[in-house]
């Protein structure tokens, strides 16, 4: 199985797999059962911003999700990613719909990682920034139902021609270049990721959510990982 570290923007509470009984932000370490969660006042039809950061000195993974003009939601978890992830990883965004549905639209996405070693050269940095997405992106690996549209947006899950969301869809987008996330001689390994998103739903209960994730470089969508498993995990263990 893939090794996954993720921050989930979970719009549908699946209490049978340990979700709280409300939409939430969660930090997932190798399991869909979140290590830490915070209640999320999800606003359908409004553009939101998610910011995820990690610092290996503090060994803390944090996420802040906000909408313009309203209070933000923060969640954090103390974890040493050196002990969880392989040295080289890929970063991505994943989303699913199930019986209930929503659009999982990404408007922009940026990422910066820095690996500071004792040597002078700081060659192990990576930065990318998408303010819009091209029709045939060379620098993204699209998996499942993920596509880019004519408006320059990334649609992680299926939408019909009129833009309405489809159920039972799973899609992921990964940056093509692997990231050197840690090294034994590194003094500090850190990263920051930011994405803006738009979730719209005709349903009273939108589902299932958008996730920022880090995984082994050869990661693929696990069989049966749709819906509540967020396109990341083969089971709910």
Swiss-Prot record:
Record localization: Vacuole, Aleurone grain
Residues reported in the UniProt entry to bind a carbohydrate: 12, 99-100, 228
Signal sequence residues: none
GO molecular function: carbohydrate binding; D-mannose binding; metal ion binding; toxin activity
PROSITE patterns registered for this protein in UniProt: LECTIN_LEGUME_ALPHA (PS00308), LECTIN_LEGUME_BETA (PS00307)
Binding residue positions for Ca(2+): 10, 12, 14, 19, 208
Expression tissues: Seed.
Record flagged with keyword Metal-binding: yes
GO CC term, one of those recorded: aleurone grain
Residues passing through the membrane, by range: none
SUPFAM superfamilies noted in UniProt: Concanavalin A-like lectins/glucanases (SSF49899)
Residues the entry annotates as binding Mn(2+): 8, 10, 19, 24
PTM comment, free text: The beta and gamma chains are produced by partial proteolytic processing of the lectin alpha chain by an asparaginyl endopeptidase. Mixture of 60% alpha lectin and 40% of its beta and gamma proteolytic fragments.
Keywords: Calcium, Lectin, Manganese, Mannose-binding, Metal-binding, Toxin, Vacuole
Keyword Transferase found: no
Miscellaneous remark of the record: Binds one manganese (or another transition metal) ion and one calcium ion. The metal ions are essential for the saccharide-binding and cell-agglutinating activities. Is being tested as a molluscicide with potential application in controlling schistosomiasis. The causative agent of schistosomiasis depends on freshwater snails of the genus Biomphalaria as hosts during its larval stages.
Subunit structure: Equilibrium between homodimer and homotetramer. Oligomerization is pH-dependent with homotetramers forming at pH 6.5 and above.
Chain's role: D-mannose/D-glucose-binding lectin. Has anti-inflammatory activity in rats. Induces histamine release in mast cells from hamster and rat. Induces lymphocyte proliferation and IFNG production. Shows toxicity against the aquatic snail B.glabrata at concentrations higher than 20 ug/ml.
Membership in a protein family: Belongs to the leguminous lectin family.
Name of the molecule in the record: Lectin alpha chain
Species this protein is from: Dioclea virgata
């Amino acid at each position: 199985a893939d090794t996954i570290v993720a921050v989930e923007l979970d719009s549908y509470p699946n209490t049978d797999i340990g979700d709280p009984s409300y939409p939430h932000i969660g930090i997932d370490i190798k399991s869909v059962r979140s290590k830490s969660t915070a209640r999320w006042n999800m606003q359908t039809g409004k553009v939101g911003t998610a910011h995820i950061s990690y610092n290996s000195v503090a060994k803390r993974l944090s996420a802040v999700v906000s909408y313009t003009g309203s209070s933000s939601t923060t969640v954090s978890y103390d974890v040493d990613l050196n002990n969880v992830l392989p040295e080289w990883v890929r970063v991505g965004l994943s989303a699913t719909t199930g019986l209930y549905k929503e659009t999982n639209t990404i408007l922009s996405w940026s990422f910066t990682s820095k690996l500071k070693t004792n040597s002078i050269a700081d060659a192990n940095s990576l930065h990318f920034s998408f303010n819009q997405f091209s029709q045939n992106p060379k620098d993204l690996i699209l998996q499942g139902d993920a596509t880019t549209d004519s408006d320059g947006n990334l649609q992680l899950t299926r939408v019909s021609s009129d833009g309405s969301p489809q159920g039972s869809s799973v899609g992921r987008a990964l940056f093509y270049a692997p990231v050197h996330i840690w090294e034994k001689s590194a003094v500090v390994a850190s990263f920051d990721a930011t994405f803006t998103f738009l979730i719209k739903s005709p349903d009273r209960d939108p589902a299932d959510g958008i996730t920022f994730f880090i995984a082994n470089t050869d990661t693929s969508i696990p069989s049966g990982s749709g819906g509540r498993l967020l396109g990341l995990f083969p089971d709910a263990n």
